[in-house]
């Protein structure tokens, strides 16, 4: 199925005053929406200060072997790694590194309101798939267009436009996202493409940049084709992605290693996001239990008051 989109109007720009029903409508129709003022400047500054050292010490990608690309010799298991450019850093472990992430991001009320609308009826509870700082240095090349839901084999079996979505991402700008410094490129409507529509990996005329000020966010479905843009500027571009998916799926990022005292400084909702609480599916059947009991009860887990 081919979907025609008016590039001048998408992604739609919304804020917290926009009715949630309109936001969900834009996401389902276009695959993405831009949220102005998703986080305030003070919170962004605190987050930056907490992650700066880890980002500076982090290594650039990609971590892959050399293959003859022109001969089509790249194994499927290596293609995923190619998403990390040679001048891009993916800084992970945010729940351990950043108190602001644990408190402000994981408890973001608007973010959870969107997730409830996307997942509640179809799947029940949800949790965090992963969260990274995405740091692009000057000279980084454009990333190939891809769907994040490719990590799920079951995504290949989605056939109908009204089939449930498996992933939604919140990409928050920590610096400006400009067309010249690698703003994420989105192909609106591509979440509706079926197997009859050939995938576009580079140079799509249908792609539009997500132009953001610090604190803005682009919210997009994991089934939407997208990719980081080329950084032609003299500045680095930095963002934070928070990826959510249903409790039915295994996250890419585990949080078993978090010290219990850190987990107990978090709210029940934040604890659920990192897998330290039992959840329920759409039929209220428990998921992620300790025997027949809730994980939090067996661990005698304390928690912070609701944030």
Swiss-Prot record:
Practical applications: Compounds in the chrodrimanin family such as chrodrimanin A or verruculide A exhibit strong inhibitory activities against protein tyrosine phosphatase 1B (PTP1B) and therefore, they could potentially be developed into drugs for the treatment of type 2 diabetes or obesity. Furthermore, chrodrimanin B, the end product of the pathway involving chrodrimanin A or verruculide A, does not exhibit the PTP1B inhibitory activity, while it functions as a potent blocker of insect GABA-gated chloride channels.
Cofactor(s) required for function per UniProt: Fe cation
Listed pathway(s): Secondary metabolite biosynthesis; terpenoid biosynthesis
Enzyme class: oxidoreductase
GO biological process: terpenoid biosynthetic process
Binding partners and assembly: Homodimer.
Name of the molecule in the record: Dioxygenase cdmD
Upper lineage: Eukaryota, Fungi, Dikarya, Ascomycota, Pezizomycotina
Gene name linked to the record: cdmD
């Amino acid at each position: 199925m081919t979907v025609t989109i008016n590039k001048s109007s998408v992604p739609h720009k919304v804020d917290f005053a926009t009715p949630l029903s309109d936001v969900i409508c834009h996401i389902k129709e276009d695959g993405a929406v831009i949220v102005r003022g998703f986080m305030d400047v003070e919170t962004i500054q605190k987050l930056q200060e907490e992650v700066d050292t880890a980002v500076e010490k982090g290594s650039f990608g990609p971590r892959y072997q050399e293959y003859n690309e022109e001969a089509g010799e790249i194994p499927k298991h290596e293609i995923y790694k190619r998403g990390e450019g040679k001048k891009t850093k993916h800084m992970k472990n945010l729940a351990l590194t950043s108190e602001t992430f644990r408190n402000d991001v994981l408890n973001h009320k608007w973010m959870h309101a969107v997730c409830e609308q996307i997942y509640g009826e179809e799947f029940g509870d949800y949790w965090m798939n992963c969260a990274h700082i995405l740091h692009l240095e000057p000279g980084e090349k454009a990333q190939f267009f891809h769907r994040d839901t490719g990590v799920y084999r079951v995504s290949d079996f989605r056939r109908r436009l009204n089939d449930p979505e498996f992933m939604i991402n919140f990409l928050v700008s920590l610096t400006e996202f400009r067309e010249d410094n690698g703003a994420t490129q989105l192909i609106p409507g591509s979440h509706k493409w079926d197997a009859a529509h050939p995938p576009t990996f580079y140079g799509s005329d249908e792609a539009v940049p997500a132009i953001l000020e610090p604190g803005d966010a682009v919210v997009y479905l994991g089934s939407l084709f997208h990719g980081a843009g080329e950084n032609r500027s003299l500045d680095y571009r930095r963002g934070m992605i928070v990826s959510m998916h249903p409790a039915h799926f295994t996250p890419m990022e585990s949080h078993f290693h978090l010290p219990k005292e850190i987990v107990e400084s978090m709210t029940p909702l934040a604890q659920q996001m990192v897998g330290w609480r039992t959840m329920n599916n759409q039929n209220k059947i428990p998921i992620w239990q300790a025997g027949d009991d809730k994980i939090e009860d067996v661990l005698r887990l304390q928690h912070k008051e609701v944030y």
